[in-house]
A protein has these predicted regions:
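Short, small-residue-biased leader/transition segments that mark boundaries at the very start
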Residues: 3-10
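Conserved active-site loop/cleft motifs that coordinate metal ions or position small ligands
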Residues: 8, 109-114, 137-140
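Short loop/turn microsegments at loop-to-beta-strand junctions
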Residues: 1, 53, 127-128
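Conserved alpha/beta catalytic core and glycan-binding cleft of carbohydrate-active enzymes
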Residues: 12-122
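Conserved, mostly hydrophobic/aromatic
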Residues: 5, 62, 136
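Short glycine-rich loop/turn motifs that provide flexible caps or phosphate-binding loops at active sites
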Residues: 1, 59, 132-135
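Structured C-terminal cap/extension of enzyme domains
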Residues: 119-163
Length: 163
């Protein structure tokens, strides 16, 4: 994959972004947190089985909840849909289940926020758009990325050909 600029499909401009992606060849952004709407099972463009290769998949971005935070806050019907689709078995393992789903997708690029690797809740959220104060303050502690975590991350990257 060349150095492309991921086109962020903001909801109000989705049709313009889709055309830009088609015309330019820029990779599209796919945010897993946007995939699980129980009212449209199987058809949502953010579900991994609907991806093309020319995209960048994220569990979430700096503007979203952490994966663990999202899982705890999302509507029950959407959480149950995500459980069935991703294979989540508990809140404790949810973030890693979503990380695995991102890695096994066909997306050319996979980006995982460190907070999700660390299985942190919304206390580690980076930004809450349209709010003042408290944004961009989270910092990873120096000893947070243990050797065990690094090995787990490496194993996932190697297993899915993303090393």
């Amino acid at each position: 994959i060349g150095l492309g600029i991921p086109a962020e499909p903001l909801f109000r401009s989705w049709h313009m972004v889709r055309k830009l992606v088609q015309d330019s060849g820029y990779p599209n952004m796919k945010v897993l947190q946007f995939a699980f709407d129980a009212r449209e099972p199987g058809t949502n463009d953010y579900l991994p089985h609907n991806y093309g290769r020319n995209c960048v998949v994220y569990t979430g971005t700096h503007d979203n909840e952490t994966m663990r935070g999202w899982y705890g806050d999302v509507a029950e019907c959407d959480r149950l849909y995500a459980d069935d689709y991703i294979g989540v078995t508990s809140e404790e393992t949810a973030a890693w289940s979503f990380i695995r789903a991102a890695f096994l997708s066909v997306a050319d690029t996979c980006i995982i926020p460190m907070q999700d690797y660390l299985n942190l809740g919304n206390e580690a959220r980076i930004n809450q758009p349209s709010t003042l104060g408290g944004n961009w303050e989270w910092r990873m502690l120096p000893d947070a990325c243990t050797g065990e975590l690094a090995e787990r991350m490496k194993k996932l990257a190697v297993t899915f050909g993303r090393a």
